[in-house]
Amino acid sequence: LLIAKYPVTIFRREPTDADLADSSVCVVDVGGDWNEDLMNFDHHQFPRDSDPLCAISLVLKHFGLYEDAHKFCDWLEVAEWFDTRGPVDTGKWLGIERETLSKLNSPIDITLLRRFAGGTEHNTGQPIWEVMKMVGEDLHQYLTGMKAKLEEVARLCEWWDMGFGKKVLFMPRVEPLSDDASSGMGRFVNDSDFSEETVALVYPDRRGTGYGMSRFNDDKRLEFTKVGEEDDVHFAHAKGFIAKTSATEKARLKELLEQSWVG
């Protein structure tokens, strides 16, 4: 996040007193000080029983994005716990064994962390620096754009009451429609009063003129392979969780959903 905003060299070392007192130097995850005016973002000095806040928490607070990040980024609270409480307590908090956490490790994460830790200086143009910048840019764009995306979903979408007694959220095709407007539909449902009743999402297919249909929260009471042989369905995943159709009429889309319901 910081290098996306300030594209400068990263030095991996302990800060000097001069660094900590210089607001033109961002000191992150070291130094024993949290002072946004001086651009110091360390959490290690906090009491053991304090709320789990790590360096990214403090940087997000600095940018005014922390509350939105907690709402829209499911991984953030887990990262805070892992960084401040360790894997054993984090596993207990999640209700899983520590060994299960280890099985979720990504080799991409491992390599990036190892390569970052292996250098004392990272500069513009180097792979690690550029990847870090991309992550910061994408996170900032995601957080600042999510509110607008949810507003777009609320403005465009409509709820369908299905014959099988559940709800479906439908987004019509309108122009202009942002490329990823449908990606906010799941979050919109979770924030609505109908999250327990909703079983599917229907949204414009970005690769065609029809619509995509997918399970909400992987509700297996919908089985889209049941409509895979329909003339206007050109794709139905073998696992049954998604289908794509050239149909554009609401009545036909509802018919396909009714056919896919297995209860």
What kind of feature is each model-predicted range?
Residues 152-158, 194-201:
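Short small/polar-residue motifs
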Residues 121-188:
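Active-site rim beta-loop-alpha module in soluble metabolic enzymes
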